[in-house]
Each structure stands twice: as structure tokens, then as C-alpha cells.
């Protein structure tokens, strides 16, 4: 991953972790995982739910959907100008053939 990719990814995952935001993680194979981000590094995300902590490889993740908006504080921006990101997911039904 490029340095620019990390500049977006790390603050987002860190905000989810610090604020204990429930998330849905969709894998590239369509499986949906739910829990809270416990930790992460360059290659994996630790996702905790009520019964288990799962190590999810980032290359298997398609989408991370927070249950609510999170406040992203970019380290290279002044504290007076926080950035908020709101993610909205819409399900689209494919017409039957």
C-alpha cells in the first residue's frame, strides 16, 4: 500500500478503534463480519465481537461500514479543522434475468 493509502486508512481505523464504533466488515467473498476494531497493522484488522476476536487480513476486506459517523483527525492537519466522514451504504437489487 502506498503512503497516501495509509494516510487515509490508519486515521479511519484508529477512530473506529478509539471510539469503539460497531462496524460491519464485508469480505471480497461476500461474507459480512460484525464487531469492533480492536487493533490493526499494515496487513490485518483484529475484529472483536461478544464471543471471539478474529484476525481479518486486509486483502480480504472489500468494505468497512461504521454503525455511525466517525470524526477523523488527520495528523498533518491543524486541530482546529477536524474532518468528519459519513459513510452511507445503499443496497441495489439486480433485476432477475
UniProtKB/Swiss-Prot annotation:
Tell me the GO molecular function terms.
RNA binding
Q: Which domain of life is it from?
A: Bacteria
Show the PROSITE patterns listed in the entry: SM (PS52002)
Q: Where is the composition biased (Polar residues)?
A: 81-97
The protein's matches in Gene3D superfamilies, at most eight in alphabetical order, are given as: 2.30.30.100
Provide the Gene Ontology terms for cellular component: cytosol
Q: What InterPro entries does its record include?
A: Hfq, LSM_dom_sf, Sm
Q: Which UniProt keywords apply?
A: RNA-binding, Stress response
Q: Where is this region: Disordered?
A: 74-97
Q: Which residues form a coiled coil?
A: none
Spell out the Pfam families in the cross-references. Hfq
* Record-annotated disulphide pairs: none
Extract the CDD domains matched here.
Hfq (cd01716)
UniProt record, GO biological process = regulation of DNA-templated transcription; regulation of RNA stability; regulation of translation, ncRNA-mediated
| Domain Sm per the UniProt entry, residue ranges | 10-70
**Which proteins does it associate with, and in what oligomeric form?**
Homohexamer.
NCBIfam families reported for this sequence: Hfq, PRK00395.1
Function noted in UniProt: RNA chaperone that binds small regulatory RNA (sRNAs) and mRNAs to facilitate mRNA translational regulation in response to envelope stress, environmental stress and changes in metabolite concentrations. Also binds with high specificity to tRNAs.
Q: Which HAMAP family does the UniProt record give?
A: Hfq
Family label: Belongs to the Hfq family.
Protein's name in the database: RNA-binding protein Hfq
Native organism is Neisseria meningitidis serogroup B (strain ATCC BAA-335 / MC58)
Amino acid at each position: 500500500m502506498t503512503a497516501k493509502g495509509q494516510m487515509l486508512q490508519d486515521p479511519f481505523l484508529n477512530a473506529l478503534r478509539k471510539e469503539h464504533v460497531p462496524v460491519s466488515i464485508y469480505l471480497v467473498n461476500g461474507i459480512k463480519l460484525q464487531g469492533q476494531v480492536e487493533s490493526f497493522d499494515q496487513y490485518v484488522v483484529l475484529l472483536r465481537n461478544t464471543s471471539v476476536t478474529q484476525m481479518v487480513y486486509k486483502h480480504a476486506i472489500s468494505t468497512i461500514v461504521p454503525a455511525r459517523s466517525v470524526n477523523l483527525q488527520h495528523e498533518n492537519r491543524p486541530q482546529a479543522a477536524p474532518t468528519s466522514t459519513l459513510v452511507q451504504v445503499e443496497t441495489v437489487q439486480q433485476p432477475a434475468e
